[in-house]
Amino acid sequence: MPLIPQAPEGLSRRARYFVEGHGLRVPRRDLTPCREVWLKHGIPPAEIDRAVAFQERWGGLALPPAPAYEGGPRVLEADAPEGSAVDGWRFPAGGCRVSMAHGFMIGPGGEFGIDADHWTPLHASTEGWVEALALADHAGYWAGTITKIRGGAVEKLDLDGFEPVPEVQGLADTWWRGKDSLIAVYRGEALGFDAPRCLRAHIYVGLDAWALAE
């Protein structure tokens, strides 16, 4: 398997460059032998199919660390789904880089999120998570200044005149584009642990029209 990955279809040009220019593809686990075992444990076939599809599309992809969540998954990797028909089914999205109080999961609708005190979707899809990683890398490179704030200061951010960045498919985490700046707001840990002090935002200022282009 080549170490240089081919970006999955459906990503923006920026995200494709990020995946292929900064990512690695390591050998991924074959989930086929797990199917019978998982079926015996009562995992629905459709949920197994979701995990297998994720593994085929994303499994083995190692990307640079995220600016939050202590870097995100080390390698994207599916594992046994867990849950119920009542609460919905989720499966792991890959192991943490460091010891964390939460894991990374794929939700019932394909959302990428964290399994903290309660399930908290960060982005509507894994594509959204990857787009956010790519945008953080891009903004961090081109910004004149980067300001990081936490807690109550995040709630005081004035986003008037900013537009949401659609490709990140933000849920708990969102990106906002202004006339010369980008703002990333990370609410996942604050929501997942009911801890407002965990709110954080990164403000990238001094971006020209090219750096702000979609």
Predicted regions and their residues:
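Flexible glycine-rich active-site/ligand-binding loops centered on an Asp-His dyad
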Residues: 122-135
